């Protein structure tokens, strides 16, 4: 992250901490996962119209199932930023093999937008990843501007499909 952007990120963090009671937490086994995923969905849908369109009832069920599986495996990193006790931003991510993989995010643009809750939550998540020993913070797909402000770099994403060819019994000999 360039020096100017580091300064801007720290400035946003300090402003939030000065103007509100800031909380940050990662969802764990002690939390009600279903309720936390519901809160993630509310914030994710509120953040942008295309995200609201993406989060169909079927996709909501998918996120719930993935969250349960990944939490039980120890990989889920569902974070929330609270401002004055109200959930203001969230990240749905995974930590695996010393990599922090950001899958989706959201924030409430109508509440505390002047405090940049999405940026602040992201900065706390990056700080967590560093403290946890992650060597890579992967923003994954998408070219949203904020990713580049946090130092994201493009890389090729390749898809490979492997299938087993049908072999007749005569060919197996």
Task: Pin down the residues of each PLM region.
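A conserved beta-strand-loop-helix scaffold within acyl/acetyltransferase catalytic domains
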Residues: 1-114
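Short, high-confidence coil segments that cap the C-terminus of an alpha-helix
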Residues: 76, 131-134
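Active-site/acyl-donor-binding loops of N-acyltransferases
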Residues: 83, 134-173
């Amino acid at each position: 992250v360039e020096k100017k952007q580091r300064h801007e990120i720290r400035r946003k963090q300090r402003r939030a901490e000065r103007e509100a009671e800031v909380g940050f937490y990662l969802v764990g086994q002690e939390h009600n996962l279903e309720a936390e995923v519901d809160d993630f969905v509310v914030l994710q849908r509120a953040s942008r119209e295309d995200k609201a369109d993406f989060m169909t009832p079927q996709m909501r069920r998918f996120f719930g199932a993935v969250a349960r599986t990944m939490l039980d495996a120890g990989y889920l990193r569902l974070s929330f930023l609270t401002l004055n006790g109200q959930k203001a931003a969230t990240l749905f991510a995974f930590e695996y093999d010393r990599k922090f993989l950001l899958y989706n995010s959201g924030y409430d643009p109508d509440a505390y937008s002047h405090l940049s809750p999405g940026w602040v939550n992201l900065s706390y998540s990056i700080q967590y990843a560093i403290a946890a020993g992650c060597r890579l913070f992967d923003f994954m797909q998408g070219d949203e501007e904020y990713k580049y402000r946090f130092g994201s770099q493009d890389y090729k994403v390749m898809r490979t499909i492997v299938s087993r060819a049908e072999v007749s019994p005569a060919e197996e000999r």
